[in-house]
């Protein structure tokens, strides 16, 4: 069904960032069962048991359906956050479930979404009859998700290689910034 799973993951991840800043344990306790646990349990249930990746959903840009690196990374980060919330509240079984699932998602990201040949993370993968079909579009959200949600450290060779590859391919934009992905025409202005 048409969902955008990163929207679920980002709420849980952001709540952890809020907690790190506020230390408002009472608030977290008040929303743990109704929001954090329900969202985390959904993410655990929405994993492809054969690959370890989240099941397909729409990407960050709401354009393509599949398993994007950004979404998989956000699910990883959210499950780690859910594990931390569970530990904080003494819910050992929940913590174990969320952390174990997050570790499987991380392994699957590195197995299915990294390209040794291209030296970058794929935008997306789909599976047909068990075989991966890759979308090799250079998408800056892919590498952003990898280091933002701590799948890999920013100095990890895969992250460094991805950034170098993207810089080489994308070039520089005269006014600064980078395109969302290769071939992006969102708000593109003519050079005429």
Q: Which positions does each model-derived feature cover?
A:
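Acidic side chains
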Residues: 6, 24, 41, 59-62, ...
């Amino acid at each position: 069904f048409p969902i955008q799973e990163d929207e679920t993951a980002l709420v849980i991840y952001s709540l952890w960032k809020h907690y790190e800043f506020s230390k408002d344990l009472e608030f977290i306790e008040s929303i743990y069962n109704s929001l954090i646990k329900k969202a985390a349990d959904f993410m655990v249930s929405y994993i492809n048991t054969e690959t370890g990746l989240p099941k397909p959903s729409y990407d960050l840009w709401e354009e393509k359906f599949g398993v994007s690196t950004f979404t998989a990374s956000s699910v990883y980060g959210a499950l780690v956050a859910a594990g931390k919330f569970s530990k904080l509240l003494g819910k050992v079984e929940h913590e174990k479930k969320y952390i174990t699932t997050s570790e499987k998602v991380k392994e699957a990201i590195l197995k299915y979404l990294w390209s040794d040949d291209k030296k970058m993370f794929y935008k997306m993968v789909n599976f047909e009859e068990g075989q991966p079909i890759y979308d090799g579009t250079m998408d800056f959200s892919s590498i952003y998700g990898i280091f933002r949600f701590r799948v890999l450290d920013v100095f990890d060779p895969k992250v460094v290689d991805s950034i170098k590859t993207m810089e080489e391919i994308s070039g520089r934009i005269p006014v600064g910034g980078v395109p969302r992905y290769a071939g992006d025409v969102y708000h593109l202005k003519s050079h005429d």
